[in-house]
């Protein structure tokens, strides 16, 4: 018997049902890699970021996430080059899907009990996605932003429901806008932290304060 179509599990109806000591025998999710490309490049390398945002409340299977990751990675590698981007899958398939297997052979009514004890066995995993939640993000240089949008457009066909491609105003994966990031960096108030950046706080003794300058906790 083949895999049940994901359209049967698309709507969010029940509470989250994660893998636990009460829910055993869950098959591994199809997606195992969530960061692709130049994931070790610093925060200053890639200033632009493009998001694929879900516009529906639904379940997205691990198979769909893996298919979208492959499609996006393939196009970006071909058009921009494997060193020119960092792709991140932003949702994780923690919700377990169940199936109550039914026999369809002759004399099946003698072997099975129908809907009695119909809780079902684990069949696969999916991610519970809300409206406005980011599914995929690509950070790159400004000249590759068009390629990133096209790569996410191709990845969009792997998902059910509606999605939107949004070009972020933020610097890469950080929470700062591009102008704000450049200003804070020129003031020495930003510390690189991998693909992200830390804002240095303005704390310290009044006696240690230089006139017209903020306190920097790293100083």
Curated annotation (Swiss-Prot):
Keywords, comma-separated and alphabetical: Ribonucleoprotein, Ribosomal protein
One Pfam match: Ribosomal_L16
Gene Ontology cellular-component annotations: ribonucleoprotein complex; ribosome
Record-level GO BP terms: translation
An example molecular function term from Gene Ontology annotations: structural constituent of ribosome
Keyword Ribonucleoprotein: yes
Family: Belongs to the universal ribosomal protein uL16 family.
Record note on quaternary structure: Component of the small ribosomal subunit. Mature ribosomes consist of a small (40S) and a large (60S) subunit. The 40S subunit contains about 33 different proteins and 1 molecule of RNA (18S). The 60S subunit contains about 49 different proteins and 3 molecules of RNA (25S, 5.8S and 5S).
NCBIfam families in the record: PRK04199.1-4, uL16_euk_arch
Protein name: Large ribosomal subunit protein uL16y
């Amino acid at each position: 018997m083949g895999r049940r179509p994901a359209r049967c599990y698309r709507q969010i109806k029940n509470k989250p049902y994660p893998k636990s000591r009460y829910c055993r025998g869950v098959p591994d999710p199809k997606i195992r890699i969530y960061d692709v490309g130049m994931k070790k490049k610093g925060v200053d390398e890639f200033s632009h970021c493009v998001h694929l945002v879900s516009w529906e409340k639904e379940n997205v299977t691990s198979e769909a996430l893996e298919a979208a990751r492959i499609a996006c990675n393939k196009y970006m590698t071909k058009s921009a080059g494997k060193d020119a981007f960092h792709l991140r899958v932003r949702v994780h398939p923690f919700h377990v899907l169940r199936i109550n297997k039914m026999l369809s052979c002759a004399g099946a009514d003698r072997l099975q009990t129908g809907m009695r004890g119909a809780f079902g066995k684990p069949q696969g995993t999916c991610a519970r996605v809300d409206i406005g939640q980011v599914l995929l993000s690509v950070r790159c240089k400004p000249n590759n932003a068009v390629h990133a949008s096209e790569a996410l457009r191709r990845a969009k066909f792997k998902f059910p429901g509606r999605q939107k491609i949004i070009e972020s105003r933020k610097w890469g994966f950080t929470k700062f806008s591009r102008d704000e990031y450049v200003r804070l960096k020129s003031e020495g108030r930003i510390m690189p932290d991998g693909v992200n950046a830390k804002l240095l706080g303005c704390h310290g003794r009044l006696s240690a304060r230089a006139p017209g300058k903020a306190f920097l906790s790293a100083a």
